[in-house]
Design a protein with these regions (language model features):
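Short glycine/proline- and charge-enriched loop/turn segments
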Residues: 45-54, 202-204, 252-253
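Substrate-binding N-lobe of the ribokinase-like
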Residues: 48-115, 317-318
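Short beta-strand scaffold segments in enzyme catalytic cores
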Residues: 70, 115-119, 127, 241-244
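Conserved phosphate-binding/catalytic loop of the ribokinase/pfkB sugar-kinase fold
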Residues: 106-108, 118-155
């Protein structure tokens, strides 16, 4: 894998993507993180000052960008992943490609690939510590090289595990690309970004509270739509369900009851399946139901991207 993509290769890629755009539906571009996940199975999440032994250690491919791209691909979308890895990132690319993700935009940098230390307790709840690595090495030049291959009608999915998000928002919006933002992990600086450029927000209850200074789901949705009236909002509440809201409609979908084994990829699975259901023409209410079902399947399995179901596993009784 080369650290720099040649100009001729970029032209060839752009031409190939233009042909695909003409023959397929919406193209999804995920600009995000690629991590190696080190997953420690524990009786409980470690407390400050406590030392405990893990029951098991697993290594998996992850990162919010990787997981959302995997979820979209497993749902049947045409998805491109842009991100940065180190010389140790080969396994991430191989795994993503096996899922059906186009990784031609991923480049290599002189640093370690990002990783995450994930604690998973006996109830399937998790706690995550991130190391950014190459995920924090995005430049304006790389951002331009990625976005130059996309145009109006394409959909961009962003999270907050990479740097350069402000630049990406501005440049993607100028190209007419529809922007989806999952502001996770949340940082106060997010509120200073030009978030009016976002078409669809995916937030959980904690992120929603941080974004709006509200605590109740109804109040969070009201405030988000007041602040960003041209956007739609999906608010996930874990085992309590999820809301969809825009300025014309609002729907709630209860979560499906399952025995949670690992919740690591729950949110990313929900995001990917909601977007693909939307692409297939389902109503917002149906998209919530489809995403909830996919997320329920994912949390009933160990691992992150490997736990994401394929579309055929869902029961379409809507």
């Amino acid at each position: 894998m080369k650290s720099q993509r040649m100009k001729g290769q970029e032209t060839e890629l752009s031409k190939a993507q233009s042909q695909e755009s003409a023959s397929l539906g919406t193209r999804f571009l995920v600009m995000g993180s690629l991590n190696y996940d080190y997953i420690y199975s524990l009786d409980h999440i470690v407390e400050p000052g406590e030392t405990i032994a893990s029951v098991k250690l697993d290594k998996a491919c992850g990162g919010k960008g990787f997981n959302q791209a995997a979820a979209l691909a497993k749902a049947g979308a045409k998805v491109y992943l842009a991100g940065l890895v180190g010389s140790d990132g080969g396994e991430l690319l191989e795994t993503a490609q096996e899922f059906g993700v186009d990784c031609r935009l991923v480049q290599e940098r002189d640093n370690r690939t990002g990783h995450a230390i994930i604690q998973v307790d006996k109830n399937g709840q998790n706690s995550i510590v991130l190391y950014g690595g190459t995920n924090r090495m995005w430049t304006a030049e790389y951002i331009d090289s990625v976005l130059d291959s996309f145009e109006k009608g394409d959909v961009l999915i962003l999270q907050n595990e990479i740097n350069g998000i402000e630049d990406i928002l501005e440049k993607a919006y100028a190209r007419g690309i529809s922007i989806v933002l999952n502001p996770s992990p949340f940082e106060a600086c997010i509120l200073s970004w030009q978030l009016e450029k976002v078409s669809l927000f995916f937030i959980n209850e904690v992120e929603g509270s941080q974004m709006t200074q509200k605590s109740e789901p109804k109040d969070i949705l009201d405030q988000m739509l007041f602040q960003y009236p041209d956007a739609a909002v999906v608010l996930t509440l874990g085992e309590k369900g999820a809301w969809y809201a825009d300025r014309e409609e609002r729907y709630f979908c209860p979560a499906q009851k399952v025995q949670a084994v690992d919740t690591t990829a729950a949110g990313d699975t929900f995001t990917g399946y909601f977007l693909m259901a939307q692409e297939k023409g389902f109503s917002a209410e149906q998209c919530l139901s489809i995403a909830a079902q996919a997320s329920a399947i994912a949390v009933s399995r160990k691992g992150a991207s490997v736990s994401v179901p394929v579309w055929a596993e869902l029961q379409m009784d809507l």
